[in-house]
């Protein structure tokens, strides 16, 4: 009998230790984000938040270029995108981009040695299109990026290929005849949940419907399947993990679907999803033929972007550091006649400005990071 107890206690201790490995080490802290007692809150762990801030520090901007001087088009050949710059500003921009994208490889990562005008290197073709992407983002997608904007560093962080890109995942091989349809793999793409492991392809590459919640008490008229709902929740887990926030950063706890009760950040997220689709479909996919196999997935699709590509665990990329404003080359020289987004946000969201039951968020619980919720994404009336 005593022997049984001696064996049982260590076994219980081992099981308990394994279970606790899945828990986050305390102390978590809670920031109220709405009415009291209704779970409108953001949860932060000061230790993890401090690490996130260190990982999302911006780099210093280069000194401003001297005004005036010859146009880059008069000096260099085959400048197609940045031709409206002076030579001084063009050179400054090239130096900055090199430090943001290929600090080890240098200029020859994108240029043929001895012939900078040549297009006989795929990275130059890609980088030219990426300049167009950044300029279009900063000039035409203010509903998403507001005045903060983006730079090459927002995604690349000193790497030729951004750390957080994705391709369509075929999933692990299945020896049995029953396939789990991408579920129960504890994948990082869905924050290690049991949800389908590829929330990207249907929603951030394709334009499948994300909403699955019925708007009536009975399910009449809502033909959404359980599988579709699980895919949607997989996307929500990915967004939450990418931004380092709870569901209530965008949604109201009592009614996730209702735009009138949602927070202003949901409007920004609506535009963000469409912005990501625009990037993947109109900027990345057209480059697929120019890319080598090392820049593609098992199905031959190119490395694409998702929320994590820019945000990297921060509710705003680089916690809202405004790097783009120091580089005029990263904006289109003249405003576009129409933004690339052809859709309008749901009509009810306009009412969410006054109706959303949320208060101005309190400062985050870590002194160095007073911003994670306080400096929230722009409210709908600013979009």
From Swiss-Prot:
Q: Any keyword Signal?
A: yes
For this UniProt entry, what's an example GO CC term? Answer: plasma membrane-derived chromatophore membrane
Could you list the residues that carry lipid attachment of the S-diacylglycerol cysteine kind.
Answer: 23
Residues engaged in binding heme 2: 130, 152, 155-156
Q: How does it sit in the membrane?
A: Lipid-anchor
**A biological process (GO) annotation for this entry?**
photosynthesis, light reaction
Q: Which residues bind heme 3?
A: 236, 247, 250-251
Region span, Disordered? 335-383
Q: Which UniProt keywords apply?
A: Electron transport, Heme, Iron, Lipoprotein, Membrane, Metal-binding, Palmitate, Photosynthesis, Reaction center, Repeat, Signal, Transport
Name of this chain's protein? Photosynthetic reaction center cytochrome c subunit
Instruction: Write the gene name.
Output: pufC
């Amino acid at each position: 009998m005593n022997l049984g107890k001696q064996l049982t206690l260590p076994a219980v201790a081992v099981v308990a230790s394994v279970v606790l490995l899945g828990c986050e080490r305390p102390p978590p802290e809670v920031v109220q984000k709405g009415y009291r007692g209704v779970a409108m809150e953001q949860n932060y762990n000061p230790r993890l938040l401090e690490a996130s801030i260190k990982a999302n520090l911006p780099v210093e901007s280069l000194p401003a270029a001297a005004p005036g001087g010859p146009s880059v088009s008069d000096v260099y050949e085959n400048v197609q995108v940045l031709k409206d710059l002076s030579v001084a500003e063009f050179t400054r921009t090239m130096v900055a981009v090199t430090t943001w994208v290929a600090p080890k490889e240098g200029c020859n990562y994108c240029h043929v040695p001895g012939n900078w005008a040549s297009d006989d290197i795929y990275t130059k073709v890609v980088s030219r299109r990426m300049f167009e992407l950044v300029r279009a983002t900063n000039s035409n997608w203010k509903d998403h990026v507001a005045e903060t904007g983006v730079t090459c560093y927002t995604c690349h962080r000193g790497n030729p290929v951004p750390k957080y890109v994705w391709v369509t995942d075929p999933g692990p091989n299945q020896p049995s005849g029953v396939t789990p349809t991408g579920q129960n793999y504890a994948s990082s793409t869905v924050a290690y949940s049991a949800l389908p492991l590829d929330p990207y392809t249907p929603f951030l590459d394709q334009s499948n419907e994300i909403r699955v919640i019925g708007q009536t008490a009975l399910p009449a008229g809502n033909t959404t399947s359980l599988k579709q709902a699980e895919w949607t929740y997989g996307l929500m887990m990915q967004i939450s993990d990418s931004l380092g926030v709870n569901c209530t950063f965008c949604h109201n706890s009592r009614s996730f679907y209702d735009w009138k009760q949602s927070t202003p950040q949901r409007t920004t997220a609506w535009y963000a999803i469409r912005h990501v689709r625009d990037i993947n479909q109109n900027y990345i996919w057209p480059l697929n033929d120019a890319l080598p196999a090392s820049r593609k997935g098992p199905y031959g699709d190119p490395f694409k972007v998702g929320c994590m590509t820019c945000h990297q665990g921060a509710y705003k990329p680089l916690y809202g550091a405004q790097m783009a404003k120091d580089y005029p080359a990263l904006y289109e020289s003249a405003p576009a006649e129409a933004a690339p987004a052809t859709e309008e946000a749901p009509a009810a969201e306009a009412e969410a400005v006054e109706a959303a039951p949320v208060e101005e968020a309190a400062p985050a619980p870590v002194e160095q990071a007073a911003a994670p919720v306080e400096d929230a994404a722009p409210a709908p009336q600013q979009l």
